[in-house]
C-alpha cells in the first residue's frame, strides 16, 4: 500500500514535467517555406536568396529558402502541383497561368495568388560582337536563343518577334537555353543573339560583357507601340548607358513586372507575416527589452542594399500590374495600409 501511494505522486510529477518541457518544444517547432526563383545567371535567384534570408531573420519559427529553377512558367506549375509554396514570376505569365490562356491554355493555375509586385523586368536583346546586329532589322537570318523552352523569356521573345513581323522560321537556327547557357553560346560564337528577360544589371550579361564585346539591340518606337497595344502588360523603358561594359548608349526596350506569388493553400497568417516583413521595419521575434528590434530594416530595404534591382522594390508599386487575386494574408496587410 505504501509503495502504491509513493508511485502515484511520482507519475504525476513526471507527467507535469513532461508537459512543462514539451510546451516550449512544440512552440519552437519550425516550419519551412520555399521561394522558387530562376537560374543563377538571372536576377530572381540572387534577390530571392536575399529575401529568404531577410525574412527568416524577421519571422520566428520559419525557415525560408530560395531555390534555383527555370523561372516563371516552371514556378507556376510547381505551385499548381503544390510542390513549392511560392515563387517569382512575370506578371504576364501569372495572368496567363491563372486564366488558363497562352502557354497555359486549358491548364489554369487556379491556386495562384499574389503577394506583391517587386521590380521591373526588362526584355534585353543581347548580340555578340561580329554578329552584324546593330538594330532589330538585322535579326533575320541569325542564330537565336529565345530563352529556355516554355519560359517567360520565350513568351517575351515571341511577343517582340510578333511586333517585328518575325517568327522562328526567319532565323538560321534556334536553340533554347538558360541565361548562363545563352551567355556561353554567345561567348563561344555559336549563337548570334539571345533574349534575356530580367532586372538589369543581369549577372549573365555582366559576366559575358567582361570577356566579350556585346551590343544591346534597341527596339524602335513603332515596334514598341505595336507590342504594347497588343500586350498592354508591357511598358516602355530605357536601359541606361553604362549598365554593361562597352554599352555606352541608352537602349530603348520594353519591360514587365516581377511578382512574388504563392499557393492559395498557404495559411493566411503566414502570408500576412511574410508580406508585413517584406515591407515593414521591425521583427516578429521577441527580443530583450532595450534592443533595437523595432528598427530592423524591412525585407525590401535589405534587398535594396544587396542588388541594383532591389532599389525598385517599393511598397508604392507593390500592386502595380497585379492581375490575379491577392492572397488573403497579403490583402489583409495592404488593407491595413489603406491600399
What are these model-derived regions, one by one?
Residues 1-31:
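Short, low-complexity disordered leader/linker segments with a strong preference
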Residues 28-97, 105:
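N-terminal (or domain-start) structured segment
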Residues 30, 59-61, 71-74, 81, ...:
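Extracytoplasmic
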Residues 30-58, 62-63, 117, 121-188, ...:
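Bilobed "Venus flytrap"/periplasmic-binding protein-like clamshell domains
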Residues 91-93, 101-103, 131, 167-267:
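Pocket-lining segment of extracytoplasmic ligand-binding domains
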Residues 105-118, 123, 243-252:
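A structural signal for short loop-to-beta-strand junctions that line the ligand-binding cleft
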Residues 142-159, 233-313:
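Ligand-binding clefts/hinges and TM-proximal coupling segments of bilobed small-molecule sensing domains
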Residues 181, 188, 198-216, 226-232, ...:
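An extracytoplasmic/periplasmic, membrane-proximal ligand-sensing/linker region
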Amino acid at each position: 500500500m505504501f509503495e502504491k501511494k509513493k508511485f502515484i505522486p511520482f507519475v504525476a510529477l513526471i507527467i507535469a514535467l513532461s508537459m512543462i518541457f514539451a510546451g516550449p518544444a512544440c512552440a519552437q517547432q519550425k516550419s519551412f517555406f520555399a521561394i522558387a526563383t530562376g537560374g543563377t545567371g538571372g536576377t530572381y535567384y540572387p534577390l530571392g536568396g536575399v529575401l529568404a534570408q531577410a525574412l527568416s531573420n524577421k519571422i520566428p519559427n520559419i525557415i525560408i529558402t530560395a531555390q534555383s529553377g527555370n523561372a516563371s512558367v516552371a514556378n507556376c506549375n510547381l505551385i499548381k502541383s503544390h510542390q513549392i509554396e511560392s515563387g517569382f514570376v512575370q506578371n504576364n505569365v501569372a495572368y496567363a497561368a491563372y486564366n488558363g490562356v497562352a502557354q497555359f491554355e486549358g491548364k489554369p493555375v487556379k491556386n495562384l495568388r499574389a503577394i506583391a509586385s517587386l521590380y521591373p523586368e526588362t526584355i534585353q536583346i543581347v548580340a555578340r560582337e561580329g554578329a552584324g546586329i546593330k538594330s532589330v532589322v538585322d535579326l533575320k537570318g541569325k542564330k537565336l536563343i529565345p530563352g529556355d523552352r516554355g519560359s517567360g523569356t520565350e513568351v517575351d521573345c515571341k511577343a517582340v518577334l510578333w511586333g517585328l513581323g518575325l517568327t522562328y522560321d526567319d532565323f538560321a537556327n534556334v536553340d533554347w537555353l538558360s541565361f548562363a547557357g545563352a551567355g556561353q553560346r554567345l561567348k563561344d560564337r555559336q549563337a548570334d543573339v539571345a533574349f534575356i528577360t530580367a532586372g538589369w544589371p543581369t549577372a549573365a550579361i555582366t559576366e559575358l560583357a567582361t570577356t566579350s564585346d556585346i551590343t544591346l539591340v534597341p527596339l524602335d518606337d513603332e515596334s514598341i507601340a505595336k507590342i504594347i497595344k497588343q500586350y498592354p502588360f508591357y511598358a516602355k523603358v530605357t536601359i541606361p548607358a553604362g549598365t554593361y561594359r562597352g554599352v555606352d548608349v541608352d537602349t530603348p526596350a520594353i519591360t514587365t513586372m516581377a511578382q512574388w506569388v504563392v499557393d492559395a493553400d498557404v495559411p493566411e497568417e503566414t502570408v500576412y507575416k511574410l508580406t508585413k516583413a517584406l515591407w515593414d521595419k521591425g521583427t516578429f521575434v521577441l527580443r530583450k527589452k532595450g534592443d533595437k528590434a523595432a528598427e530592423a530594416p524591412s525585407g525590401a530595404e535589405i534587398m535594396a542594399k544587396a542588388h541594383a534591382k532591389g532599389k525598385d522594390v517599393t511598397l508604392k508599386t507593390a500592386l502595380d500590374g497585379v492581375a490575379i487575386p491577392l492572397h488573403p494574408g497579403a490583402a489583409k496587410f495592404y488593407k491595413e495600409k489603406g491600399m
